[in-house]
């Protein structure tokens, strides 16, 4: 199955997992909207919406940069409108953008709490709401949230209550919207990595270069997302997928190809 000719609106696609998903779709010849905040290079976070579009075009897709902060309704409306005007609609939404702050209750400033909920929960809901009118008229429409299974175990709440609440809020969107739009044949699923993924967040927050050795590459999430997004939207919905389980189903058994360092012990991700 291919995403050729499909139009994907991907939030947070200027780097990391979002960009990897974008580039995998581009290899099929998809139209890919890079919806992210980074207009100019950041000293600690490589990549902008413009550099991502250059890579998408080079990979065989058609990219479009949308500088957008998904906390703001007007900005999302404008980005979605521009996308529909240029490409004639939207087939797939990937809610990848996310804010993270790993601290306990007493050490989490309310501005951090607010940011995580505005980006992770409200942003996911808002982007879904604005894209849905276009998805309703699309063929094999999908929404994919990069969020964890709803295990609801105390061990995942205790160290960082606010972050867990915000990520589970994204997953609750899957739980509700998959049922709400099943009759309309819009698939709504979640995808989460089994292990830590080599992104700027891991490098900056979880231990630098040593932590990166224990990660898998973002391409494992991209390949898993590609499989999900090419499934029949009328039946493949309401799932909380884990990347390596998806690849096993897809017949990909060599997971060493995704390791940053195949000799290093992999770092498990949160929530699993």
Task: List PLM regions with ranges.
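Active-site loop of short-chain dehydrogenase/reductase
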Residues: 6, 61-62, 89-90, 135-149, ...
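Substrate-binding pocket helix/loop in short-chain dehydrogenase/reductase
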Residues: 104-105, 109-114
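Catalytic loop of short-chain dehydrogenase/reductase
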Residues: 136, 142-183, 192-197
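C-terminal helical subdomain
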Residues: 190-191, 208-272
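Conserved Rossmann-fold SDR core element
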Residues: 25, 89, 171-174, 181-193, ...
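Short-chain dehydrogenase/reductase
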Residues: 2-87, 101, 111
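A short, exposed helix-loop element centered on a Lys and neighboring polar residues
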Residues: 128-129, 175
């Amino acid at each position: 199955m291919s995403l050729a000719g499909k139009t994907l609106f991907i939030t947070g696609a200027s780097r990391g997992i979002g960009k990897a998903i974008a580039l995998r779709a581009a290899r099929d010849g998809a139209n890919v909207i890079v919806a992210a905040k980074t207009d100019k290079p950041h000293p600690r976070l490589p990549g902008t919406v413009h550099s991502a579009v250059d890579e998408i075009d080079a990979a065989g897709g058609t990219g479009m940069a949308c500088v957008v902060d998904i906390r703001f309704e007007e900005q999302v409306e404008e980005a979605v409108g521009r996308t529909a005007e240029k490409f004639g609609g939207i087939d797939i939404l990937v809610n990848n953008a996310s804010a993270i702050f790993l601290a306990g209750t007493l050490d989490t400033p309310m501005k951090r709490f607010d940011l995580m909920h505005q980006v992770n929960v409200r942003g996911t809901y808002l982007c879904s709401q604005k894209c849905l009118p276009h998805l309703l008229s699309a063929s094999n429409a999908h929404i994919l949230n990069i969020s964890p299974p709803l295990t609801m175990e105390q061990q995942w709440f205790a160290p960082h209550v606010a972050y867990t609440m915000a990520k589970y809020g994204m997953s609750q969107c899957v739980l509700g919207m998959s049922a709400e739009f099943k009759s309309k044949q819009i698939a709504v699923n979640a995808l989460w990595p089994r292990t830590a993924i080599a992104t700027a967040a891991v490098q900056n927050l979880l231990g630098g270069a040593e932590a990166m050795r224990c990660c898998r590459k973002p391409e494992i999430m991209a390949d898993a997302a590609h499989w999900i997004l090419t499934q029949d939207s009328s039946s493949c919905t309401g799932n909380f997928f884990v990347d390596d389980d998806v690849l096993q189903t897809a017949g990909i058994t060599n997971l060493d190809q995704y390791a940053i360092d195949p000799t290093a012990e992999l770092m498990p991700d949160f929530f699993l």
